[in-house]
Design a protein with these regions (language model features):
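Acidic-basic catalytic patches of nuclease active cores, encompassing PD-(D/E)XK
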Residues: 1-34
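Conserved catalytic cores of phosphodiester-cleaving nucleases, focusing on short active-site segments
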Residues: 20, 46-63
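A generic structural signal for well-ordered alpha-helical segments
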Residues: 20-21, 76-78
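Active-site metal-binding core of divalent-cation-utilizing nuclease and nuclease-like domains
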Residues: 26-51
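Surface-exposed substrate-engagement region within the catalytic domains
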Residues: 28, 74-77
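Hydrophobic/aromatic beta-strand patches that form the interior of the parallel beta-sheet core
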Residues: 28, 57, 84-86
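Active-site-adjacent loop/helix micro-motif of nuclease/hydrolase catalytic cores
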Residues: 38, 55-74
């Protein structure tokens, strides 16, 4: 039996939460019911907190729309709060996560294994545009 998109989404969100917990963060995910889908600020699936670092994150499967990226980039949060988008990238040999971090007005991109190890860092400083 084929899994629903919602169930697959929950599984991906759970995996990201586990990675943050492995890195020492406390994680709070959105509480959802069958008929009520609410994200933090209608944009983020969860938040992670460690020391003085607060991260709001969004989890996507395979593709991220430019509109979603722009919305999250432009969403006003204090400069000390990070906005991170996790994109599941299925591969033939081994699936990985692409992590897009928006810190103040800069965008950073890296790749993380399913186990939470950073595989490759690609830093793109400066404005997203």
């Amino acid at each position: 039996m084929k899994q629903s998109n919602v169930k697959r989404g929950y599984q991906k969100e759970y995996k990201v939460a586990k990675i943050y917990q492995k890195w020492g963060f406390m994680v709070e995910k959105v509480k959802r019911t069958r008929f009520n889908f609410r994200d933090f600020f209608n944009k983020f699936d969860g938040m992670a907190l460690k020391d003085r670092t607060l991260i709001f994150y969004q989890v996507k499967s395979n593709v991220i729309d430019k509109e979603v990226l722009d919305e999250i980039f432009q969403f006003p949060l204090p400069k000390s709060v990070y906005k991170v988008i996790w994109v599941w990238r299925p591969r033939k040999k081994k699936a990985i996560w692409e992590r897009i971090s928006i810190i103040q007005d800069s965008v950073f991109r890296d790749y993380v294994s399913q186990e939470g190890e950073i595989i490759k860092e690609e830093v793109k400083g400066g404005d997203k545009k």
